[in-house]
Amino acid sequence: MSVLVISCNSEWDEEQYEQYISFKAPVGDKGVTDIYVRYKQGGEATYRLPMIVSGSLPNGKDRTVHIAVDTDTLDILNAARFGREDLYYVALESNRYAFPSTVDIPAGTFSTLLDITFNLDNIDLFKKWVLPLSIADDPSYNYEGHPRKNYAKALLRVLPFNDYSGTYSTTAMQVYIKNRDGSIDKSEAIPTTTRTAYVVDENTVFFYAGAMDEDLIDRDKYKIKFHFEPDGEKLVKITSDNDKIKLNQLKETSYTIAEVPDVTRPYLLHRYVTFSVDYEF
């Protein structure tokens, strides 16, 4: 006589993973998470940061998650990544943001959103502003933050944007060094492929002049503001707060805007700002 005994365990009735709490804030190659916030002169803008409960089963209980600012982690990142303090990420000033100290994740749900309100009036993007957040742990809390270091922390690089900021293709840009006698050798052009425009206000951005490197120690001296007049002839006017660079716009410049829907994702709109400007400094 033979007996066959079979044991069956419904593996999906038991939790396969710990139900840890984490931010959904993927870290980029620069050690932080870039977030883009619409610049509003005199107003506030809200960014919604996802928070999730890990696990293979639905969240089984109501959880109240505590959020804290974590400048220690930012200090560690700066020390490990940069050899110069002028390149450090800077903790965003406390008067420029607000968020609730706790967030509720109801039973039966896997995620929620942390609403962060920003006030970015007159912010100087010469500095690399970061809002460092952490999920606070305590034995009295009814949750655990994720033990992996990048999951329970969010280093949010705050990047305001307007209709003219972003990365520009500059493959056609030509930068020359003027000789002492005022002549220019056009065979010695300095090549550049892209330049980044940073927000100043709703209709103004700044670039670093010419081919100046964005990691230059005294790069702040070479900020050139480009003001895009939204009406009329759509002119571009350039200025600098530093008279010592002797900025001179050589000709009047206008700009055009083209908006093209994405071919495969119709909810996306590609916006192309085009202009040509001649200046010397």
Protein language model features and the residues they cover:
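Multi-pass membrane catalytic core of lipid/isoprenoid biosynthesis enzymes
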Residues: 3, 105-107
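Sec-dependent bacterial lipoprotein signal peptides
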Residues: 1-9
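Intrinsically disordered, low-complexity regulatory regions in eukaryotic proteins
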Residues: 8-104, 113, 117-131, 136-281
